[in-house]
Amino acid sequence: MVPPSAASIDRFIDGVWIEDGLAALTLAAYRRDLSLYAAWLQAEHGLVLDQSSEAHLLGFMQQRHASSRATTANRRLTVFKRYFRWALRENIVRADPTVRLLAARQPLRVPKTLSEAQVEALLAAPDASTPRGLRDKAMMELMYASGLRVTELVQSRTVHLGLDEGVLQVQGKGARERLVPFGEEAHAWLQRYLLQARPQILAGQSSDDLFVTRHAKGMSRQMFWNLIKRYALAAGIQVPLSPHTLRHAFATHLLNHGADLRAVQMLLGHADIGTTTIYTHVARERLRQLHAKHHPRA
């Protein structure tokens, strides 16, 4: 028999997937957070998820997040709020215990990014005379040219690529589709990869994935992250990096060169322009640095 909490979580996950078309990774995170709380509630109080009170939720959050970052606590609270709103709508609970729970204040987290010179050094690091190096070069050029998320990059298929048009069809968060353009430099490297490197890597095998490994499968997020770290080391880049370093650089450099914020929002696939606004802080900080360095009265 399926435990009551697990059954409720399953129904909720199915519901939000149908309603919003959330990505598999997001659904997995929802399930993980709710299952963790349900297990705690059962162990500490002998209750199931739908018997939660505000006090129970506060106790869990205080116990689990006493020393963690506000962003982690807020993400989990968002999941709980969404679950109990759904449970109330479905008449599973009589009241929403999260109504009075407020998100913790958190500092503005500005994305780590690279200067244009550092990006050039990173993009020059792969040995494009080898099949794998050419593949890696094409991947990084495309990411910097289009601002793709890592998941969007590694999950791209050959049918999604419009090489002649210079666009890639992408399914982003929430199953939202968009067309992302890329420039001549990325086009040239993609063309070389498709004609020269990809057939050599596949060695007679077939694959629908755009960027392939020797096993004729797509690259994982972790594999691409390892590549970024390796090439950054080779390029002598010592600033903190993330898997989305080139995506952050794409947005910041566009804004530095006067791009419209709404246009950048569309290119990045952000549902809320508030998410894109964070990059304006990076751009302004860069302008302050340039002013301090070059203005005679700075």
Regions found by a protein language model. Give the residues of each.
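Conserved catalytic core of the tyrosine transesterase superfamily
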Residues: M1-A298
